[in-house]
Amino acid sequence: MQSDTVKKHCYSSSSVLFVFVLALGAPLPAAALAQSDSGIARWIAAPHRTPRNVARDPFRHPLETLTFFAVKENSTVVEILPGSAGYYMEILAPYLKERGRYIAANRDEAAAPRYLADHQKLLARLKGEPALYGKVMVTKFNADKHEIAAAGSADFVLTFRNLHNWIQRNEVDGALRVFHKALRPGGILGVVDHRGRNDMTQEAQMKSGYVRQDYAIAVIEKAGFKLAGVSEANANPKDTKDHPEGVWTLPPSYRLKDKDRSKFEAIGESDRFTLKFIKQF
């Protein structure tokens, strides 16, 4: 059930907020990319990355996204649920290895059985490539137990395409409390997720995997964060958001398998918002 605060943000946003979001929503300027940390670009281009992850770069825009969040090589970064695929782990863990810290907050052995195999794959991968992942810290992020980092120790908490799941399961408030506790004052929460339609309520598209951007902002600000920026780095105007199996119709999931595959391949991965929040003191 939506709170009055959330409803107000979703259905009666002021013109001031609208202009603010539009002003922040432009793609990252070329000048900003030119000033991005060359270390991030180097690890994005490094040969250790899996071909499957590299193939997703045109849709996930890692350089633009991490530059927008302003991650630096001496940062302490907690990534929520990197999983065994480790798309951002492949980039962030070696980038932060010498001067910063990368923390993988993942489901562990206490999680549901369906997640156990993935967690074991993650641990095996870390152990098998110590030159890249030898300093990765693995912490817990289960539905009922969160020990992601010491209180006030993280410069960044980053979460990619997880918010919709927590909203569906009524776990979002608990997750945001954990993030707020882990971040230092002024620390950054970075959120990327499938952007929902503005002509539908959040409830109406809940099971599709999409989240209204204004709804996401309202929920997160209610938890003690302040919106600091909006990026269109991960936008996809081809995404009509009316697919038979929701966001999972599109790549890389292709839930319909070969049915209309060329159509959904032409659309590409989902339209996504990229939001940056600051922890309030």
Where are these regions (language model features)?
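Class I SAM-dependent methyltransferase Rossmann-like catalytic core
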Residues: I40-F68, K72
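A short acidic, Gly/Pro-enriched loop at the edge of an enzyme's catalytic core
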Residues: E147-V157
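C-terminal lobe and adjacent flexible extensions of AdoMet/dcAdoMet transferase-like proteins
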Residues: F264-F281
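S-adenosyl-L-methionine
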Residues: L116-K145
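A short, conserved alpha-helix within the catalytic core of class I
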Residues: A143, N165-V178
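Conserved class I S-adenosyl-L-methionine
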Residues: E73-S84
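A short glycine-rich, Lys/Arg-flanked "PGG" loop and its adjoining helix->strand segment in the class I
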Residues: A93-P94, V172-P185
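Conserved beta-strand signature within the Rossmann-like core of class I S-adenosyl-L-methionine
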Residues: I103, G186-H194
